[in-house]
């Protein structure tokens, strides 16, 4: 049995450098838990001159970690999609274990990698929610269960912005600037605020929970950029919080996947998750509801998850990458058949008969109102009507909103948020 495992590390940014730091600082406990010594033999970076003072070789030759026979595990922390995918394919072709934190690459290529890998281990715990061990929970801890549903706060940036808007009455623009100033949001935050990052993670979790190969373009994805303080005020008034959720539900003949802002009751555990923290609620048919909470990003939480994969590979505890012997064939639920309650915000002319017009259109689409709030806009002839509905379907609600937008008394495109009970 080998007494030492050698790592080829691709990328020495925030996460990569923290992996190196933890492997050095915690080397004794890692050795005790892995059963072997784990050392970085070589790291590959774009600019060798910027990375000095390490006890291992620094190279700018990506092929060298693949071809080096002394390297047992390649750890990819470079970012991007196609270049990491090519690295993964070449690594697995050499029957070397591969560890990645790359959610975007896995969202597009997870099934191809599983087919290439065969019995060669692939670790990707760090790809979803950083320090939360949700991958292992779905693959191992909950493997005796049918996963009935899961929903979660999968993106820390959007959760921080929504928390600031809810607690401090900040505008979306100001909350985003604050997140960027603190380093929680990128200068180009599009993937975070538009729900794409959360959707990447949802697809990976859905593969583990249901064995399906869903594509990004097949699922409903909406971001948080259209949410305004008025929406937060309505939520507070009626006992809700607003969170960007990734949601999965198993129906008898299909799987429902969606990412969007959701109003959730304050009694719901996820409503208490604030700031940059992540959390996922999973319901199994035997275990019931379980909740997983923790830091979803950052150098140390993500590096911790990367090293947990390395230790698991060192223990030779390999298993099917996505947890299913054969791909499952359940289709995705069509977007227009989604059923939930809804909230909408309308800017209208402040005149008689407007609300009766709105009520009539909702009734014609078999939509019944639950709560209503009307706000006059001072020194204008305009008002805002905010309302929530009882459960209906997506097709009916979208049709009603389209008809409402065509009313002369409705002055702007209606805004909508789904309620997740």
Swiss-Prot record:
Enzymatic reactions: L-homoserine + NADP(+) = L-aspartate 4-semialdehyde + NADPH + H(+); L-homoserine + NAD(+) = L-aspartate 4-semialdehyde + NADH + H(+)
Key words, A-Z: Amino-acid biosynthesis, Metal-binding, Methionine biosynthesis, NAD, NADP, Oxidoreductase, Sodium, Threonine biosynthesis
GO MF term set: homoserine dehydrogenase activity; metal ion binding; NAD+ binding; NADP binding
Active site positions: 201 (proton donor)
Binding site residues for NADP(+): 15, 46, 103, 183, 186, 298
Domain ACT positions: 343-418
Binding site for L-homoserine: 186, 197
Biological-process GO terms, alphabetical: methionine biosynthetic process; threonine biosynthetic process
Function: Catalyzes the conversion of L-aspartate-beta-semialdehyde (L-Asa) to L-homoserine (L-Hse), the third step in the biosynthesis of threonine and methionine from aspartate.
Protein name: Homoserine dehydrogenase
The organism of origin for this protein: Helicobacter pylori (strain J99 / ATCC 700824) (Campylobacter pylori J99)
């Amino acid at each position: 049995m080998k007494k030492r495992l050698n790592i080829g590390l691709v990328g020495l940014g925030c996460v990569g450098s923290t992996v190196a730091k933890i492997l050095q600082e915690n080397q004794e406990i890692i050795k005790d838990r892995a059963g072997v010594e784990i050392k970085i033999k070589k790291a590959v970076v774009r600019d060798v001159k910027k990375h000095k003072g390490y006890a291992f070789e620094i190279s700018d030759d990506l092929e060298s970690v693949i071809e080096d026979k002394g390297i047992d595990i390649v750890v990819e922390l470079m970012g991007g999609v196609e270049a990491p995918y090519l690295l993964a394919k070449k690594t697995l072709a050499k029957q070397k274990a591969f560890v990645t934190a790359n959610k975007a690459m896995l969202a597009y290529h997870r099934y191809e990698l599983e087919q290439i890998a065969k019995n060669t281990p692939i670790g990707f715990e760090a790809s979803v929610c950083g320090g939360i061990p949700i991958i292992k929970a779905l693959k191992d801890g909950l493997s005796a269960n049918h996963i009935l549903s899961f929903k979660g706060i999968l993106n820390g940036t959007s959760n921080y912005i929504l928390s600031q808007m809810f607690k401090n009455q900040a505008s979306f623009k100001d909350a985003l600037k604050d997140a960027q100033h603190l380093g929680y949001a990128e200068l180009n935050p599009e993937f975070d605020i538009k729900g794409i990052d959360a959707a990447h993670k949802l697809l990976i979790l859905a593969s583990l929970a249901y064995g399906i190969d869903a594509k990004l373009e097949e699922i409903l994805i909406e971001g948080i950029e259209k949410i305004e303080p008025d929406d937060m005020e309505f939520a507070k008034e009626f006992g809700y919080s607003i969170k960007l959720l990734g949601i999965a539900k198993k129906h008898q003949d299909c799987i429902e996947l969606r990412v969007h802002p959701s109003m959730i009751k304050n009694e719901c555990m996820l409503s208490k998750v604030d700031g940059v923290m992540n959390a996922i609620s999973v319901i199994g048919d035997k275990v019931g509801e379980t909740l997983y909470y923790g830091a979803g990003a950052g150098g140390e939480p993500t590096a911790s998850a990367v090293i947990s994969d390395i230790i698991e590979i060192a223990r030779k505890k390999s298993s099917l990458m996505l947890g299913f012997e054969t791909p499952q064939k359940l289709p995705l639920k069509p977007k227009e058949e989604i059923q939930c309650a809804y909230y909408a915000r309308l800017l209208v002319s402040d005149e008689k008969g407007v609300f009766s017009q709105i009520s009539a259109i909702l009734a014609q689409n078999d939509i019944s109102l639950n709560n209503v709030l009307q706000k006059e806009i001072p020194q204008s002839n305009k008002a805002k009507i905010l309302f929530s509905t009882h459960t209906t379907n997506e097709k009916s609600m979208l049709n009603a909103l389209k008809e409402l937008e065509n009313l002369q008394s409705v002055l702007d495109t209606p805004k909508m948020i789904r309620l997740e009970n």
